[in-house]
Design a protein with these regions (language model features):
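Rossmann-like NAD(P)(H) cofactor-binding subdomain of soluble oxidoreductases
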Residues: 16-97
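Internal alpha-helical scaffold of NAD(P)-dependent oxidoreductase catalytic cores
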Residues: 9-16, 78-80, 97-189
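Short, glycine/polar-rich helix-capping loops at beta-to-alpha or helix-loop-helix junctions
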Residues: 8-10, 71-72
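Interdomain hinge/lid region at the active-site interface
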Residues: 182-205
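N-terminal Rossmann-fold cofactor-binding loop
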Residues: 3-7
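A structural preference for short, hydrophobic beta-strand core positions in alpha/beta folds
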Residues: 1, 21-23, 132
Length: 205
């Protein structure tokens, strides 16, 4: 099932996933053994402050933040619940299309040991690899993902700007540089990091 603060959003998501629509948190909690808070990072603690006062005994409470650990649900165990963070290493930019990439995504998980293995098995049965990470190293993990994803995009945008300053139209600059980027990604997929290097870095110019 699905619940959101907006009825429109709730209906849209429930229709899209062919699941039940819920109009309050209490009812979806009652009907579920596992809940995923798929919300912005800044909203996790706010929702938890409300949720922790409800009957969450024997519930798996999960969020999908890359940077925040399961300790966001700071007293879940005292409330009889089990806290987890489960994060897909996948670029998601469209709620109605990006889910298609999840089939090939690797997930990471950390949290209470009680149901951790059974949660991992759910993803494994879907064909996904899922890796346990150290709760204390969640920020380090997130920094790795950001550098491989967001920073690459930012560097590519800078490359376009530099070529534009050379008099090349931005659209053309993107088209010119994309094969270069794609070639490097292909090299990374095929060779060790050192052997994937090309150009002045590889030549030590």
């Amino acid at each position: 099932g699905y619940f959101s603060k907006s009825l429109k959003s709730t209906k849209s998501a429930a229709d899209f996933t062919s699941t039940k629509l819920y109009i309050n948190l209490e009812n979806i909690l009652k009907d579920s053994d596992t809940l995923f808070l798929t919300v912005p990072d800044g909203s996790i603690s706010q929702i938890w402050d409300y949720m922790r006062n409800l009957d969450i005994r024997n519930k798996n409470i999960c969020h999908c933040s890359g940077s925040i650990s399961s300790t966001a649900f700071f007293d879940a165990q005292n409330k009889g619940a089990y806290a987890y963070s489960i994060h897909p290493l996948c670029a998601i930019n469209d709620r109605y299309e990006a889910y298609k990439n999840l089939a090939n995504a690797v997930f990471t998980i950390e949290g209470n040991s009680e149901h951790l293995d059974s949660l991992m098995q759910i993803f494994q049965k879907c064909g996904n690899d899922i890796i346990k990470i150290d709760t204390q190293k969640k920020a380090l993990y997130h920094a790795s993902a950001v550098m491989a994803s967001n920073l690459v995009t930012a560097l590519f945008a800078t490359s376009i700007d530099l070529l534009n300053r050379c008099g090349v139209d931005k659209k053309m600059a993107k088209n010119i540089l994309l094969p270069l980027l794609q070639g490097n990604v292909a090299n990374l997929a095929t060779f060790d990091i050192k052997d994937a290097l090309t150009g002045p870095v590889e030549r030590n110019d």
